[in-house]
A protein has these predicted regions:
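Hydrolase active-site cap/lid region
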Residues: 27-28, 167-216
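Alpha/beta-hydrolase active-site loop
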Residues: 119-140
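Conserved alpha/beta-hydrolase
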Residues: 92-112
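Short alpha-helix in the alpha/beta-hydrolase fold that links the catalytic acid
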Residues: 241, 255-265
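Catalytic active-site module of serine/aspartate enzymes centered on a nucleophile-bearing elbow/loop
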Residues: 279-283, 288-312
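The serine-hydrolase catalytic nucleophile loop
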Residues: 81-92, 107, 257
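N-terminal cap/lid segment of alpha/beta-hydrolase-fold proteins
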Residues: 27-65
Length: 312
């Protein structure tokens, strides 16, 4: 009987820890500078994923001028996408202002896109990105000098998969994408939350192991089963196009140090890795050094890299 009581207490602790963390340790608000959709110039587009028979929507940001332009297809992070998400819009507007076309799709099951990301594997989501690339290749409104992909957060898992399947991509960018499995990433995230709450390392490790496996599985069982053991490293090993991978040293969602270590161990000459001190999962400006939702150094790094890769 006592054993079951103990198990029940542990399970309840694991289930409610994320809520407690948010209530007891709320993040200190920062007045980040956010780009609003109303402040951008864009076209609403629609295209089709013929592989999985899905109608998809999105926003197309085209620079001023005649081109040719490099173009980037954004691969979304986890969850439902929103067209007014300031993180994505900050990147899209910067690239557009610097002569780069950006296709920001509606993630399947979001906004104007059919399908359901909750029951889709990374391989499924990669077909949506391939469809977006096909759309850009087929359009005749403006000339392009090259097309690449930008995987943001979870999209960093998908980006190298797309690069393996699509011929003639000009570049690949991963913004705070994990180089560990989703199982490892969830364990890292839960462990951090528990440590912040005051649990000792040994206890937090055990509770995080149970919590990361059970809470996410209960919330989204189909998705968890599809992606939990996905390993991105075999795809990164064979990447043969110019690739830029950016991490935030203070990322509490993705184990940036371990991710950078694994990537560097591949010794792939096509991959450039950079870690920004003082930035977390958004690659935001460090405290006291501005309030950009994505630090300007990272934005400049991405736009400069894309132009260089597209010109090769």
């Amino acid at each position: 009987m006592k054993r079951w009581i103990l198990i029940t207490v542990l399970v309840l602790a694991v289930l409610f820890v994320p809520v407690l963390v948010k209530q007891i340790l709320p993040p200190e608000p920062r007045p980040f500078e956010r780009v609003a959709l109303a402040d951008t110039a864009y076209l609403e587009i629609s295209f089709e994923n013929r592989t999985q028979d899905l109608a998809l929507g999105g926003l197309l940001f085209v620079p001023e001028g005649d081109g040719p332009f490099p173009a980037a297809v954004v691969i979304h992070g986890s969850g439902t996408s929103r067209r007014d998400n300031g993180w994505y819009l900050t990147l899209a507007k910067h690239l557009q202002d610097n002569g780069i076309v950006v296709l920001l799709p509606d993630k399947r099951g979001s906004e104007h896109s059919e399908g359901d990301w909750r029951t889709s594997s990374f391989e499924d989501l990669a077909t949506d990105t391939r469809a977006a690339i096909d759309y850009l290749r087929a359009q005749q409104e403006f000339p392009l000098s090259g097309i690449g992909v930008i995987g943001m957060s979870q999209g960093g898992w998908i980006a190298p998969l797309v690069a393996k399947e699509v011929n003639d991509l000009a570049f690949l960018v991963s913004m705070v994408g994990p180089m560990v499995t989703p199982r490892e990433q969830l364990l890292y995230e839960e462990n951090y939350n528990l440590r912040q709450l005051g649990f000792l390392p040994g206890i937090s490790n055990v509770l995080a192991y149970v919590g990361s496996a059970n809470v996410r599985h209960l919330a989204q069982p189909k998705l968890y089963e599809l992606i939990v053991d996905y390993n991105p490293m075999p795809y990164w090993q064979v990447v043969s196009i110019d690739s830029l991978v950016l991490f935030g040293a203070d990322d509490t969602n993705v184990p940036s140090a371990e991710s950078a270590k694994r990537l560097m161990a591949l010794n792939n000459p096509h991959i450039r890795v950079k870690t920004y001190e003082g930035s977390g999962h958004a690659l935001e400006s460090p405290r006291g050094l501005g309030n950009s939702l994505i630090r300007i150094e990272a934005l400049d790094e991405i736009s400069g890299f894309i132009h260089g890769a597209a010109d090769n």
